[in-house]
Amino acid sequence: MSVKHVSVLLLLLQLSCCFRTGSCGKVLVWPMDFSLWMNLNVILDELVRRGHEVIVLRNSASIFIDPSKQANIKFETFPIAATKDDLEDLFVHYVSTWTNARQNSQWKYFSLLQKLFSEYSDSCENACKEVVFNKTLMTKLQESRFDILLSDAIGPCGELLAELLKIPFVYSLRFTPGYTMEKYSGGLSVPPSYVPIILSDLSGKMTFMERVNNMLCMLYFDFWFQMFNKKRWDQFYSEVLGRPVTFSELVGKADMWLIRSYWDLEFPRPTLPNIQFVGGLHCKPAKPLPKEMEEFVQSSGEEGVVVFSLGSMVSNMTEERANLIASAFAQLPQKVIWRFDGQKPETLGPNTRIYDWIPQNDLLGHPKTKAFVTHGGANGIYEAIHHGIPMVGLPLFGEQPDNIAHMTAKGAAIRLNWKTMSSEDLLNALKTVINDPSYKENVMTLSSIHHDQPMKPLDRAVFWIEYVMRHKGAKHLRVAAHDLTWFQYHSLDVVGFLVSCAAFLIFLVIKSYLFVYQKLVKIGKKQKRD
């Protein structure tokens, strides 16, 4: 078949998708970089496959968002003052600070986290200004007549663009610190009695003191911590729109929240019709490994292989730490595939091979893989769940400790402290998850839960995006809580009214009693005088 015929066939296939869903739409994307882009990119590829036109706004210093690698997606690049090296240095600073901050007390850790997010908020604001104050770009966007905007709630500005372009918008996100945006802008209920607050490192089965800690974490994030400088963002958004408006108000206009989690990783909690859980949307069947890697895996025999990766966002490791890990791996009967771009450790055993990059999903889906040593990023966790591989967690930053805490509580992982673990600790943890059948059984149960859904996570995410496009929004799915003040939401006005009524009734009863009593006393005195 000629290239021309193939192109026509693909076009007809796209058009058939449009006919099924009603129409093809134009999607504007305000993305985040690094692993957040990888998650969003999976959705965008599926939207394009279904015939939609996707345009991504990217800044000139983007690291992972590379137009040359995606011919099927259009990109609109806007200039910013920072360079690619500046952003890489900034990101390394964020990761290093966040990782090291965990060694402090919880409250010192939260204080350092606040400072980190203040810096992040400033960089987001600068990027947003480069877009909304770029008249040429904004005119082009307005003339494009988009049907929907897709963004990550962790990177503000998408909601402002949607307001300026007068189009509905959908969030794709893993979490915001303390679930504050999900609660106060999305209307999501998070009872601290049984729902662990994100970044608290707690699981769904909490002791009394853990529930106390969970409550304190919630209060801290609610009343002290600010992910973004709301006063500045309120002022900025009001200036751009020419009317008083708040950051939370615009965020609350989101038509749909696509949360990249599911009940295999999360614990049960209340939810809403415009909040959909789509964890593991990037998961897919394993493909064949490269020939050399497949030969190494097959050479492991019955013992199998262990896969170790700290993900795409962590590349630096001290020589001492690398030697400690290599020493533990060298004592295993299994073969080990390690993603590592540092200097070769002196203690590296003949059973271990190092690669700058590995096909992680394909390795985890290989029948000879016995265990996965991971930093606990949501992408890796979900690939392990998808393929049913027990884990040893070495959480570093972000929600990684929470993810590993959840997997540990579900009996699918063992958690170690990255800073304090010894070579023996890592060796024993790996032996346990490989040789104790309960870990494999538990993760296979989670895998069964993950696969047993009426619709695949990716299909569900795309369905709701198309749903919002078809209905030009999804305001009918938003709860009335968005229109209530905080005291109305908690029914304090109703409680106050009922208490007032009860107090008034008690007052009337007491007054009536006193009146009758005084009358009876007067009658008694009169009878005595007579």
From Swiss-Prot:
Q: Origin, by domain of life?
A: Eukaryota
Provide the membrane topology annotation. Single-pass membrane protein
Report if keyword Glycosyltransferase is assigned.
yes
Q: Name one Pfam family in it.
A: UDPGT
A molecular function GO annotation: glucuronosyltransferase activity
The region annotated as signal peptide is 1-24
Record field: transmembrane:
494-510
Q: Which residues are glycosylated?
A: N134, N316
Q: What is its EC number?
A: 2.4.1.17
Presence of the UniProt keyword GTP-binding in the record? no
What's the main place this protein lives?
A: membrane
Q: Where in the cell is it found?
A: Microsome membrane; Endoplasmic reticulum membrane
Q: What is this protein called?
A: UDP-glucuronosyltransferase 2B14
Q: Which SUPFAM superfamilies match?
A: UDP-Glycosyltransferase/glycogen phosphorylase (SSF53756)
Q: Gene behind this chain?
A: UGT2B14
| InterPro entries, alphabetized | UDP-glycosyltransferase, UDP_glucos_trans, UDP_glycos_trans_CS
Catalysed transformations (reactions): glucuronate acceptor + UDP-alpha-D-glucuronate = acceptor beta-D-glucuronoside + UDP + H(+)
**Keywords per UniProt:** Endoplasmic reticulum, Glycoprotein, Glycosyltransferase, Membrane, Microsome, Signal, Transferase, Transmembrane, Transmembrane helix
**Which Gene Ontology terms of cellular component type are present?**
endoplasmic reticulum membrane
Q: Which CDD domains match?
A: GT1_Gtf-like (cd03784)
Family, similarity comment? Belongs to the UDP-glycosyltransferase family.
Q: What is the lineage of its organism?
A: Eukaryota, Metazoa, Chordata, Craniata, Vertebrata
Q: Which purpose does this protein serve, as stated in its record? A: UDPGT is of major importance in the conjugation and subsequent elimination of potentially toxic xenobiotics and endogenous compounds.
Enzyme class comes to: transferase
